[in-house]
Regions:
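Ligand-binding loop in jelly-roll beta-barrel domains
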Residues: 84-109
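A structure-centric signal for secondary-structure junctions around beta-strands
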Residues: 32, 51, 95-96
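Short, conserved beta-strand element in jelly-roll/cupin
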Residues: 49-64
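Short strand-coil-strand connectors
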Residues: 31, 65-69, 92
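Short acidic-glycine-tyrosine-enriched beta hairpin
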Residues: 68-83
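A short, N-terminal "cap"/entry segment at the start of jelly-roll beta-barrel domains
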Residues: 1-37, 42-47, 114-117
Length: 117
């Protein structure tokens, strides 16, 4: 069950549009954050977004391309993509699904001057 403060994978999957529609659904919005589930089938058609985003892989594995680099991913992995950066999932399993969180202002957030690292 999904409430306004608890998102379940089962409810998110049941709310995805049927193919051939893009397999994405927003589930929660708060402040600048928009949270959804992304489960592309076959090909990932997305391009750069106007806001920073975080993916948390729920199931499946494959490779992720970001700004010309390609890296493998699997369940539990977290992927960060700054606003405006080209990216996509490639060679992913048929059951791939990831939580996605868009946040911050258009153009992305700037690092804090006093942030560690």
């Amino acid at each position: 069950m999904t409430t306004e403060w608890l998102l379940t994978v089962a409810d998110a999957l049941s709310r995805l549009p049927a193919p051939p529609e893009e397999q994405f659904v927003y589930l929660l919005e708060h402040g600048t954050a928009k949270i959804g589930l992304y489960a592309p089938r076959g090909v990932d058609p997305q391009g750069p977004h106007q806001r920073d985003e975080i993916y948390l892989v729920w199931r499946g594995q494959g490779s992720f391309e970001r700004a010309g680099e390609r890296h493998p991913f699997g369940p539990g992995d977290l992927i960060f993509v700054p606003a405006g950066m080209a990216h996509r999932f490639v060679d992913f399993d048929d059951d791939f699904a990831a939580w996605v969180i868009f946040y911050g202002p258009k153009g992305g957030e700037q690092p804090l001057e006093d942030s560690p690292g």
